[in-house]
Design a protein with these regions (language model features):
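C-terminal active-site subregion of NodB/CE4 polysaccharide deacetylases
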Residues: 4-7, 20-97, 173-267
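Core hydrophobic alpha-helical transmembrane segments of single-pass membrane proteins
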Residues: 9-17
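Active-site beta->alpha N-cap acidic-glycine motif
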Residues: 30, 48-152, 159
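Short loop/turn segments at strand-loop or loop-helix junctions that form parts
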Residues: 34-38, 125-128, 164-169
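Catalytic metal-binding/acid-base residues of hydrolase active sites
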Residues: 102, 167, 203-206
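Extracytoplasmic/secreted cell-surface and envelope-processing proteins
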Residues: 106-107, 131-134, 170-173, 208-211
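Structural detector of well-ordered beta-strand residues that form the stable sheet scaffold
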Residues: 122-124, 161-163, 201, 221-224
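Histidine/lysine/aspartate-rich catalytic loop segments that bind and position anionic ligands
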Residues: 147-150, 154-185
Length: 267
């Protein structure tokens, strides 16, 4: 009797495994990871409002080690875009790493760790938050990458890409007050004053029909969202609208083991 039960359990597990493998092969999805700030425990104490959005340096490196040890491929924007259009196939263990807002801590801590582990990432910059030049790093987590630092980063780190998080729309609720023409101007300002790009990340994840229309008119090819509900925190599929690409938020204190489990899920 006991042998029959064990045999039955084995059959069930094999069936589940076959269903899982078949589903993932026929419905390929890629996790787009969303980070914000990186810092030390001491730096986080000085800026309480950033604690929820700030990953400890050690925690971040442990996550990168986990990705490396489990043979994950980190993608460039071009690779992700080509996969989404069906031009290329990618390994199941593929991720796109993104950082929102363009904090100076990304340059101070994250970029060198990503380079150490030979990994790619994309940073979404807020144009009007960027000064011409930066002071030396003083531990203030609310400091943003300057235009001068952006140029240095592009020279020092060929594994890091930069794209738009808007020029001057990073305020809660501001989208409701903007006309279509004002949205077009904001996108033009970013390209003229910061960098040329065809990839966008919605400020606070907010978008509407005018926003999407203006992005298309401005020759943006992809746009990433951030929530706002739990169902939008999921892996991206080829079927997702190119202007509503979902991401997974990497929360403060997330253990590498928990992140690995999330990445291995098919949704």
């Amino acid at each position: 009797m006991k042998k029959k039960m064990i045999f039955g359990m084995i059959i069930i597990l094999i069936t589940i495994a076959i269903i899982y493998i078949t589903y993932t092969i026929n419905n390929p999805k890629i996790a787009v990871l969303c980070y914000h700030n990186i810092g030390t425990q001491e730096e986080k104490k000085n800026v309480p409002q950033e604690q929820e959005w700030t990953i400890d340096i050690e925690n971040f490196e442990e996550q990168l080690k986990m990705l490396k040890e489990n043979n994950f491929k980190t993608l460039t924007l071009e690779e992700f875009g080509n996969w989404k259009q069906g031009k290329i196939k990618l390994p199941y263990k593929s991720v796109l790493i993104t950082f929102d807002d363009g904090f100076l801590s990304n340059y101070k801590y994250a970029f060198q760790l990503l380079k150490k582990y030979d990994m790619h990432a994309t940073v979404f910059l807020i144009g009007n938050y960027m000064q011409e030049k930066n002071e030396k790093w003083n531990g203030d987590l609310k400091t943003y990458i300057s235009k001068e630092t952006l140029q240095k980063a592009k020279e020092e780190y060929n594994n890091i890409e930069f794209a738009s998080h808007s020029y001057a729309l990073h305020e809660p609720g501001i989208l409701k007050t903007k006309s279509y023409e004002e949205l077009l101007k904001d996108e033009k300002d970013f390209k003229e004053k910061v960098i040329q790009t065809q990839v966008y990340c919605y400020p606070f994840g907010a978008y509407n029909d005018d926003m999407i229309k203006s992005l298309k008119e401005s020759n943006y090819k992809m746009a990433f969202i951030f929530g706002p509900t739990k169902k939008e925190y999921r892996k991206a599929s080829k079927k997702d609208d190119n202007y509503c690409i979902p991401r997974l938020n990497v929360s403060y204190g997330m253990k590498p083991s928990k992140l690995l489990i999330r990445l291995m899920l098919p949704f």
